Amino acid sequence: MSNIHDMEFLQKKVQELKEQGLYKELVTLEGPSDAECVINGKKVINLSSNNYLGFANHPRLKKAAIEAIEKYGAGAGAVRPIIGNMKIHDDLEKLLAEFKREEAVLAFQSGFNCNAGVIQALTDKGDLIISDQLNHASIIDGTRLSKADKAVFQHSDMADLERVLKEKRNNYNNVLIITDGVFSMDGDIAKLPEIVALAEKYNCLTYVDDAHSSGVLGESGRGTVDHFKLHGRVDVAMGTLSKAIGVVGGYVAGKKVTIDWLKNRGRPFLFSTGLPPAAVGAAIEAVKMLMESTEYTDKLWANAKHFKEGLGKLGYNIGHSETPITPIIIGDEAKTLEFSKKLFENGLFSGPIVFPTVPKGTGRVRCMVTAGHTTEQLDRAVKICEKVGKEMGII
């Protein structure tokens, strides 16, 4: 009889992943996340981070983080509802509310925590959550935690969304329609104006996850709501401090009454220690930089256009991305892993995305262009993609 502490059941599952070509090893950065970085001792062009604006290693953010530590210490010391709420937290939320053009904001420890806590706090038994088929895992898990009933509509299919509304709306108290602003695997933008129109037609609430559009879409990166000029018509806008902002954390923006409720019933907010001062100080500086100039967002979009054009000329399948997210769709899982491995060997890191993150048969390397990349680096990346693609018979 085997020893239960040997975790034999997990050993079998890990072995199955390896046999299926789905097992992934963690790579280790030996320095900051930047346009070029050192991974496992090798210097490579980094096309895998969510550091859209190049802020993660920006001198202004590092200086602000150090100053915040010197003033407030290394940690908050408690959950914010007890004695972990520092003035720097309030300053961040006030600035974010101004930036997002919303009444109020509440910051969470991560974007995942934000969705997991907010969705369940806003819905209850007798309510219905309607979610896009390709919404992020944090939305799926937040929905599971809710007592509300759930329904899913086909990805960005407004006819299917209206079908669900016609069938179900009258059976529930409140209905919450949730969508990603930008879908992280394909880079397409939600049809937010159409979603809002249907929500208003059927008297529903709307919730947009702006994780991949904060700092990317809208004026100076204000997000999807600003991109479509839907201020006052989207009830909840979630954002992250971990991607374009370059630090860590998440936040939700909306009406003051919504934020007041979440301060009392948002479980991750209630039961997790507040964000550390260094992260908050750096995030404040990043938002200030966005409010000062469009320099970084302009560079991001120019770089994305340049890189997409280069891949397009090679004949790669880059899907229907409308944002800097640029998938190179390979298909077969094992071939995707091999493609990513060969890119790395040639000086380019773009991590493989395979099942269960994306459906089987749609494996891809997801290239994340940033404002921090130079034209020379992007041209070099395209040449590496050309070399590997031809060697493997992909192009």
From Swiss-Prot:
The keyword NADP does not apply. Keywords: Acyltransferase, Biotin biosynthesis, Pyridoxal phosphate, Transferase. Belongs to the class-II pyridoxal-phosphate-dependent aminotransferase family. BioF subfamily. Catalyzes the decarboxylative condensation of pimeloyl-[acyl-carrier protein] and L-alanine to produce 8-amino-7-oxononanoate (AON), [acyl-carrier protein], and carbon dioxide. GO terms for biological process: biotin biosynthetic process. It comes from the Bacteria. Its cofactor is pyridoxal 5'-phosphate. InterPro entries: Aminotrans_II_pyridoxalP_BS, Aminotransferase_I/II_large, AON_synthase_class-II, AONS_Archaea/Firmicutes, AONS_Archaea/Proteobacteria, PyrdxlP-dep_Trfase, PyrdxlP-dep_Trfase_major, PyrdxlP-dep_Trfase_small. Substrate binds at K24, H136, T357. GO terms for molecular function: 8-amino-7-oxononanoate synthase activity; glycine C-acetyltransferase activity; pyridoxal phosphate binding. The keyword Iron-sulfur does not apply. Pfam families: Aminotran_1_2. Homodimer. This is 8-amino-7-oxononanoate synthase. Pathway: Cofactor biosynthesis; biotin biosynthesis.
